[in-house]
Amino acid sequence: MGFALADPPADNCCAGGRNLSEILAYLPVFILILTGLGLLLNLPYRWLLILFSLQFVAAFWLILLSWPLGLAAVKLLVGWMAVAIIGSSINEEESPTDFDWKLNDNFFKIIAGLLILLLAFSLGNTAFQWIPASFAVISGGLVLAGLGLLQLGLSTQPFRTTIGLLTLLSGFDIIYAAVVNSVLVAGLSALVSLGLAFLGAYLMNVEHLEDQP
């Protein structure tokens, strides 16, 4: 007398797949939190550019949940181009040579960043009710937008101001991509991102020339 092994219920398999995809959707949000907080600190410019590049990877990941690969890849490629443009205008002599931990400065930035995260997740829980997107997408976009605004409010340096503006724009792109699927929107966002990068690079060069005797 033989015994046949019963196949696992299809509903359980589908539920397991959905749970895995939901968990993976929160991974880029975690990366955005780490990179966003890291960009607030007094790190060498080279490390800041690496964090900025990783931030665009995580933003691409979240946009990919709403847009097809071709459109989402535009955000990643344009983001890396913006990083290259900004990096080409960096004055290494003005960059910190090591991690510059000023207790009163960086500690305040971390606390302010954590408050922004708390606010972003609180608003995300509310916006989740009326925006047709997952909580990971909404919270990730709000986290980037909030940390970008914080970056703008904490510094007047062209380098950090440009990073703040591009971070804010990335947060907007993540949320807007969940609402509208448009080639025109992707192209317009790319033009604005490159324009901000070129403007930031120009202001960085002007600042460097003014500092020279």
Predicted regions and their residues:
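Intrinsic-disorder-associated, low-complexity terminal segments enriched in Asp/Asn/His/Tyr and depleted
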Residues: 7, 11-12
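Alpha-helical transmembrane segments of multi-pass membrane proteins predominantly involved
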Residues: 13-213
